[in-house]
Amino acid sequence: MTREEATNNALSKVLLVKSTILNLGTGMGKTLIAIKCINKIADFNFKQNEEETTVSIIVPRQALIENWKAEIKKWGCNTDKIEILCYDSIHKVNNYSDILVFDEGHHLSELKREYLDSILKVNPNVKLLFLSATIPRDIMDYMKSLGTYNIVKGNIADGIKDEVLPTPIIYTIPLYLDNIKSVAEIIKNPRCSNPVTCNYDERWNFIKRFTTRKIIIKCTQKQYYNELSDKIDWYKRKFMFNKTVVFKNKWLRAASERLKWLSEQKVDICQSIISLLQDQRVLLFCNNIEQSLKFKDYAPINSKNKNSLQNLDDFNNSKINHISSVNMLSEGMNLTNCRVCLFCNLNASEILSQQKFGRSLRHPKPIVIIPYFKDTRDEELKDKMLKDYDSSMIKEITNIKDIKL
């Protein structure tokens, strides 16, 4: 589906349905389509009753408020009665707005849906616009349940196929966990003192013998990964058996720990890759703030860095060419002329993976680089992330010097 087709689809039905759901990938022009829908509704309302249309736009973060203001100024809006606020302030929304716009609509948690339900009770004729590249099934079902709807759908892969978005070169780099050198440690009885040390093959004997002493088990990368995976599987089975929230939390925490550990093992290869990218404009995705600080030449963008927005502005104005991100820049934040996206971290969330992938598609010749560990959760997430993309875009390489810039 082209941008023009998506726009025509939305505009042709926006006056006829309760909800217009713009389920479109990054770069497909969701914001502009939404503004055009607002204008069409506003024109219709003015012809009907000569009153200006009121609009409430709800966004995930404060920074996106400025994005919307800039887009409205750029494209023009047929009403001045517009309020823009964050999801956390949804309780402050004008209950009698003519149009409610939910940017990044996948943020509609159960609590936020309750607020929307309360608005619909007092304002049943309000028009709804939902914008999101990736909408979970439960939220999509909720959107459909609100009345008549029109879904305008197209993912990033569709946008590339239809030449709406540029075709990226995707380099995947298989890595292997070492199973020879003992470079990691597994700690048992961490709160105990008087530690003893053993190798991986001796672990069960030591665990049985030293129940009141701290045990340090020397192991390889592969053995450490297997230990993490066994722990995840055990917590998962316990949760599936008795549905106890405690085990669910431990299962999810262990799964997060595994992804963090895999990401840490890729720091060296990513350091080598970025040494080849000195002349490129690069976005590096990291797992955590501590990891991002290891890449000293990359300006960090994260929730703890008060200079994050300045770093983003400097990047977009070409004052700097290299930035790293931790749990930011995945949605709604535009990057100017960013050619390379390097993934030091892969996400279990399909929503986050696709949002991050879309950051690179603002450049006419984008490059995506994904190092991953074979036969691990990393490989599963890489395959899941790329499942919709044509194989001709994907180049598996074993030598980073094969990256063509």
Predicted regions and their residues:
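Post-DEXD/H (motif II) to motif III coupling segment of the RecA-like Helicase ATP-binding lobe
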Residues: 110-170
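Conserved segment of the helicase C-terminal RecA-like domain
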Residues: 359-391
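A short beta-strand element within the Helicase C-terminal
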Residues: 98-101, 322-326, 330-347, 352-354, ...
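Conserved pre-motif I regulatory segment
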Residues: 1-23
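Walker A/P-loop
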Residues: 17-37
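Conserved helix-turn-beta segment of the N-terminal RecA-like "Helicase ATP-binding" lobe
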Residues: 53-55, 62-82, 98
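Interdomain linker/hinge connecting the two RecA-like lobes of the SF2 helicase core
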Residues: 18-21, 157-281, 286-287
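Conserved helicase ATPase core of P-loop NTP-dependent helicases/translocases
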Residues: 66, 70, 281-285, 290-333, ...
